Amino acid sequence: MKFEKYIDHTLLKPESTRTQIDQIIDEAKAYNFKSVCVNPTHVKYAAERLADSEVLVCTVIGFPLGASTTATKVFETEDAIQNGADEIDMVINIGALKDGRFDDVQQDIEAVVKAAEGHTVKVIIETVLLDHDEIVKASELTKAAGADFVKTSTGFAGGGATAEDVKLMKDTVGADVEVKASGGVRNLEDFNKMVEAGATRIGASAGVQIMQGLEADSDY
């Protein structure tokens, strides 16, 4: 099992500089991570720097609130792909979910999935803002909309992934949709908990620390 391929090496801070983007790109290339996940403004640069590697470029759409219009999310998606994005992590309309406007939530996801045709789409449901039933419903809508992954968190809402939420999401979507855990995965112990709960992708700024922990662990 190639654990490095579980990791989306992530830098989404608004103050991220080109120097910091260079650092995570260099680290991702060194460890052969699945992707680097950066804000849309950095996608074109990252794609150019990663053109000679297997590392993919992931970006975020409707981030971090999910409260932009569907048309805006579609434009962001098309623009990101034109700039070289391989994977799209979008945020759902959280307020619509809480209102019970499930058709609106699903159509929002479907529009991004259509705009990103041929590219992986991960749907951020922001678990820290949801109760048990809302996590289940958001996961069901993600699956119904044809997305590839359901993802826990933006990291901007005061909480991140928990193993319990990851398991609930995985139990809900089954084998057809994967689960990405993000937010607060800082070391090998956190990583292992998420993978054991059913995550097959981990969004983390601590990818290097996780891999160093794996290298130091005689079980791997």
Curated annotation (Swiss-Prot):
The keyword Transferase does not apply. One of its GO terms (cellular component) is cytoplasm. Signal peptide: none annotated. The keyword Lyase applies. Its main location: cytoplasm. Its EC number is 4.1.2.4. Keywords: Cytoplasm, Lyase, Schiff base. The active site is at D89 (proton donor/acceptor), K151 (schiff-base intermediate with acetaldehyde), K180 (proton donor/acceptor). It comes from the Bacteria. Pathway: Carbohydrate degradation; 2-deoxy-D-ribose 1-phosphate degradation; D-glyceraldehyde 3-phosphate and acetaldehyde from 2-deoxy-alpha-D-ribose 1-phosphate: step 2/2. Belongs to the DeoC/FbaB aldolase family. DeoC type 1 subfamily. This is Deoxyribose-phosphate aldolase 1. The gene is deoC1.
